[in-house]
C-alpha cells in the first residue's frame, strides 16, 4: 500500500478530527463527502489479484485491503478505499467512496463514507451519504441525492436549516440505525443515533 495510506489511516481521518489540519475547515459530514477525492491526492492504486471484477482508476486510485472480499462481476471506480474484512457483493457498482473495515455492501454506491461495522448488503442506490458505525440498511433502501428542481440541498442540523452548498447530497445515517426493506430516504435526510425506520413512504427529513 502507498506510504501515505500506511502512515495516515483513512479510518482515522474521517472521524471528524478537528485537530487534523486536513479537516480544519470542515464542519459537517457533507464537507467530508465533498472532500473524498482530496484524501487520495497522494495515493496510488493498491489491490491484490481480483478475478472477474472491473477496476477503473482513471479518475482516482483504488485501494483495497488484501483481507477484503470482492465478489465477481463488480464494478469499482476510483477514488475508492475498501478497508479490512469488508465484503463487496456481486454485481455491485461502487465509486468515489470510502468503506471502512468490517462492512458489507451491495448495489449502487456513489460518493459515500461508511464507518466500520455497517451493512448495506442488498440492492438499492446510496449516493452522497454518510453512514455511521453499526448501521444496517434493509433490502431496497434507497436515497435521493438530487432534487427535481436542481436546487442546493438543505439539511436540518442542530435545530437550524443549513445549505450544503451542493445540488448533490443524500442522507446522514447515524450509528446503530436500522432501515426496513424498501425504505426511501429524501435528499438531506438526517437519521439520528439508534433510530429504526419503518415506512411505506418517505420518512420525515
Model-assigned labels for residue ranges:
Residues 1-48, 205:
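Terminal amphipathic alpha-helical/low-complexity segments used for targeting or macromolecular assembly
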Residues 90-91, 103-205:
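Glycine-rich hexapeptide-repeat left-handed beta-helix
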Residues 52-62, 66-92, 96-97, 102:
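Glycine-rich phosphate/diphosphate-binding loop of Rossmann-like nucleotide-binding domains
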Residues 49-50, 117:
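A short, structure-level motif marking secondary-structure boundaries and short turns
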Residues 50-52, 160:
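Short gly/ser/thr-rich secondary-structure transition/capping motifs
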Residues 27, 31, 59, 77, ...:
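Conserved active-site and cofactor/substrate-binding residues in soluble primary-metabolism enzymes
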Residues 28, 84-86, 127:
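A diffuse structural propensity rather than consistent per-protein peaks
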Amino acid at each position: 500500500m502507498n506510504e501515505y495510506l500506511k502512515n495516515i489511516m483513512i479510518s482515522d481521518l474521517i472521524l471528524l478530527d478537528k485537530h487534523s489540519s486536513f479537516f480544519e475547515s470542515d464542519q459537517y459530514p457533507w464537507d467530508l463527502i465533498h472532500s473524498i477525492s482530496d484524501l487520495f491526492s497522494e495515493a496510488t492504486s493498491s489491490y491484490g489479484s481480483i478475478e472477474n471484477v472491473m477496476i477503473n482508476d482513471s479518475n482516482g486510485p483504488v485501494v483495497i485491503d488484501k483481507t477484503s472480499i470482492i465478489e465477481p462481476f463488480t464494478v469499482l471506480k476510483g477514488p475508492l478505499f475498501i478497508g479490512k474484512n469488508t465484503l463487496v457483493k456481486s454485481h455491485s457498482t461502487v465509486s468515489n467512496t470510502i468503506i471502512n473495515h468490517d462492512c458489507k455492501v451491495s448495489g449502487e454506491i456513489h460518493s459515500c463514507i461508511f464507518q466500520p461495522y455497517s451493512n448495506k448488503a442488498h440492492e438499492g442506490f446510496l449516493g452522497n451519504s454518510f453512514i455511521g458505525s453499526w448501521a444496517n440498511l434493509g433490502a431496497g433502501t434507497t436515497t435521493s441525492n438530487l432534487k427535481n428542481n436542481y436546487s442546493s440541498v438543505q439539511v436540518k442540523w442542530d435545530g437550524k436549516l443549513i445549505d450544503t452548498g451542493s445540488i448533490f447530497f443524500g442522507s446522514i445515517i447515524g450509528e446503530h440505525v436500522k432501515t426496513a426493506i424498501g425504505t426511501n430516504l429524501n435528499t438531506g435526510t438526517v437519521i439520528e443515533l439508534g433510530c429504526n425506520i419503518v415506512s411505506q413512504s418517505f420518512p420525515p427529513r
